[in-house]
Amino acid sequence: MDFSSLLLLLLNTWISAYSMAALLALVLVYNLRMTKSSSSKTTSLKGKKIITRPPAVTGAWPVFGHLHLFGSGEHPHEMLSKLAEKYGPSFTMKFGKHTTLVVSDTRVVKECFTTNDTLFSNRPSTIAFDLMTYATDSIAFTPYSPYWRELRKISTLKLLSNNRLESIKQLRTSEVSVCFKELYDLTNKKNDNGAPVPIDLKRWFDEVSNNVIMRVIFGKQNFGSKIVLGEDQEAVHYKKIMDELSRLSSLTMLSDMVPLLGWLDYFKGDLRAMKRNGKELNSILQKWLEEHKSKKSSDARQDFMDVMLSISKDTQLYGHDQDTFIKATCLAMIMGGTNSTEVALTWILSLLMNNRCALHKAREEIDLLVGKDRQVEDSDVKNLTYMNAIIKETMRLYPLGFLLERDTKEDCEVSGFNIKGGTRLLINVWKLQRDPNVWTDPMEFKPERFLTENADIDVGGQHFELLPFGAGRRVCPGVSFALQFMHLVLARLIHGYDMETLNGEDVDLSVSSGGHVNIKSTPLELILTPRLHPELYDCET
C-alpha cells in the first residue's frame, strides 16, 4: 500500500473535532487491547510453555497495524519474504482491522488446503469488487455455501469441461488465426528509414486474449481486433470500462482496511468512480444478455452466455437473481481469463528472449514435430514437452499473482498454532515457488527442471510447491482452457517468427507495483521476421 499517500490524505482532509476525538478514543482502546493480547501468546502446562499462536510482527501502529511497512516502495511479496526470514514461515500481521496469517512454507500451505480446506474456502472481497463486479453473486467472491458449490459445478461441468472445450476449439483457433494474420501484416510495415517497425507483443497478447475470451463467452467475433483498430464503438467503450475496472480495483481503500475512516474515501472521488463504472459495465452486460435472449443458437455454436441461459431455469439459485447470476458468472470468466493469459504470455516470451538457448530448443522441438509446411495445431500441443516445461518454469518465477489471499470464519489449527475465526490467510506464492529447500537454483530460469527431477509437478493445484492457479476449493476452474490457449499461441509465435529485441538488449523484467496481478511494467517491443511460407499466415475468418 502507498502509505505516504494515505497519510497525505489524512493531513489534507478536514477532520471535525468530534471525529478527531473519536479517533483518539479508538487509539486508546486499541492500545489497551494490544497490550492485553500481546501478553497471552503462550499457555503453560506443568511448567512447560506451549506456543498457541504464531509469531506476530512487532511495530504495529494503532488502528493501521503494519500498513506503514508497505510505504517504502518495496514490493509487498519481497517485504513479506524478508519478514519470513526473521519470523519464520508462518507469522501474523495487522492490516488495518484484519489480522492476517502470512505463510510461505509448502507443508503449511498443504495443511491449509487439505486438512483446513473448507475453513479457508472464502476469498476476501473489497469495496471495489463489491461495487463493480457483482461480488456477492460471483463465483470469485461469494462465500463458500450451497450457492457457491452450484456455481462451481456449472463452471467445471458445463462451461469448462473437456467436452465443452472441445466443442469451442474451432472458435478459439479461428480467433487466434485472425490475430496471427494481423501480426503478419504488421511485420511488413517499415519506418521512414526502411527498417522494420517494432511490435509491442504485450499489447498484441492482450488483443488475442480479448479475441478468444469474448468469442467463447459472448460470441463477439474479432472483438479484440476491433478494440485495437477502433472500428467498433461498443468494443472501444467496453475496453475503456474494463481498463477503469482494473485501475480502480488496484486502489487501496480505507473502507477495506480501517472502516471507521472509510468516509474519507468519498473525498477522493474513487467510490463515485467505482459506482459509475459498475453501472456502465452492468449496462453493457445486460444489453448483451438481452441480445442472447432474443436469439437461438445451435448447440455447436453456443457461447458461454447461451449455455448459462439454457441451464439457468433448472439451476438452484438460492434467492439470487437469474440475470445477475448469468452476468456475474460471465464477468468472472472474463476477469479470470483475459488479463491473466496476456500477463502469462508476456512473461514467457520475455524470459525466452533473455534465455535464447531455451528459445532455440523450443523452436527445434516444434520444427521437428510440425515441420515448415503447416501451422501448429491444437493436436500438436500435447507433444511439445519442452514447451510445457517452459510454461511451468515461467509460472514458477512469475505466477499470475505473487500473493494468494483467503480467510476463515471459524477457529482452526494451522501448523500447531491456534488461528482465530476471521483471520485472513496470505500465501506468499513468490517466496514459496523460489524456496531453495524445494527448488535447485531457485532464482534461475531452467525449464529442464520440469523434464527431470520436477517432471511430475503440474500447475493444477495438487502440488503445493507450484501454485500459479491457486489450490483447494477455490483453485481456478479455467486451468485447462488457459493452458490450451497459451500453448497454441506461444507455439505458433515461436514457430512462425524469428524474434529480436531492440538493439540486441535484454528485455526489462521489472514488475509493475500495485494491483492484484503480476504485470510487466514496460512494453515488450520486438522485431519479428516471418520464417514460414507467406500462405501459412493467411486465414479464413
From Swiss-Prot:
Any single biological process term in GO: isoquinoline alkaloid biosynthetic process
Pathway assigned in UniProt: Alkaloid biosynthesis
Top-level taxon of the source organism: Eukaryota
Membrane-crossing segments per the record: 9-29
Record keywords, A-Z: Endoplasmic reticulum, Heme, Iron, Membrane, Metal-binding, Monooxygenase, Oxidoreductase, Transmembrane, Transmembrane helix
GO cellular component, one term: endoplasmic reticulum membrane
Function: Catalyzes the conversion of protopine and allocryptopine to dihydrosanguinarine and dihydrochelerythrine, respectively, in the biosynthesis of isoquinoline alkaloid sanguinarine.
Protein name per UniProt: Protopine 6-monooxygenase
UniProt lineage: Eukaryota, Viridiplantae, Streptophyta, Embryophyta, Tracheophyta
Designated gene of the protein: CYP82N3
